[in-house]
């Protein structure tokens, strides 16, 4: 999570407003991208052990739940009042995706046995675990750590021209017990729409200054405003000196004045908006232009 001195921090998100195609999820290993925070040297953790490749698909109804369908999802006892460090229990669905105890990406608990993250965070070469229930990325005394049984990367995940379908689901080895610090977030139905200028929130343990090598120890949060598609595309095109449409259907942009946005290590975390006291995940941290620029 970065707080820079630029006039506007810009981040592209992958929308979760449509169910995944019902097809076989065979052998989908994500290519390496620069966004996840994988080791202190900036590369993947050399100690991570191999993991079996992604397997057949998860239940599609994970993507059709809505706040009204469950009294358990999307509720937190704490109100948002601002700040940098997230208060304990403010984001009970926040997950740290890890290899050998090292944080690489964020994630979100969507049921007792499923975690949602970014596709580019997952490789078939590694075993993963998830840590939840504590705002500290390192302290495991008060948190729950569960091994990942299977990983499913979206079958149409691609980095050609632009990043598409950057989603993955992690099936846990056993269900977690819900507590005040461990709760699932709500996932919107397909026809759900996010309006421009909606104030939403992103959280993560990513780098604070862009050039730092280590993740933030304490979970960070920052509010972001949803940007209209056309405006976002123009800004991205200008930044990349390109005339191509980089922002495509299935993406949404978030921005914050004064250069506050996500950074390496925040990938896979969620963009969540509050509706009628219920938190709904509308996007996943996928990619951006620098950190806090």
Curated annotation (Swiss-Prot):
CDD domains (UniProt xref): Tryp_SPc (cd00190)
Domain of life of the organism encoding this protein: Eukaryota
Disulfide bonds: 105-121, 200-273, 232-253, 263-291
Membrane association type: Lipid-anchor; GPI-anchor
Top class in the EC scheme: hydrolase
Segments of this protein annotated with the region Disordered: 33-60
Biological processes, Gene Ontology terms: cell differentiation; proteolysis; spermatogenesis
Residues annotated as transmembrane: none
Keyword Lipid metabolism tagged: no
Keywords: Cell membrane, Cytoplasm, Differentiation, Disulfide bond, Glycoprotein, GPI-anchor, Hydrolase, Lipoprotein, Membrane, Protease, Serine protease, Signal, Spermatogenesis
SUPFAM superfamilies attached to this UniProt entry: Trypsin-like serine proteases
Residue ranges of domain Peptidase S1 in the record: 80-293
EC code(s) of this entry: 3.4.21.-
GO CC annotations on file: cytoplasm; extracellular space; plasma membrane; side of membrane
InterPro entries for the chain: Peptidase_S1_PA, Peptidase_S1_PA_chymotrypsin, Peptidase_S1A, Trypsin_dom, TRYPSIN_HIS
Record-linked Pfam families: Trypsin (PF00089)
Signal peptide per UniProt: 1-26
Entry-listed glycosylation sites: 141, 177, 276
Any one Gene Ontology molecular-function term assigned to this protein's record: serine-type endopeptidase activity
Cellular localisation: Cytoplasm; Cell membrane
Function noted in UniProt: Plays a role in spermatogenesis. Involved in germ cell survival during meiosis.
Family: Belongs to the peptidase S1 family.
Protein name in the entry: Putative serine protease 42
Gene expressing this chain: PRSS42P
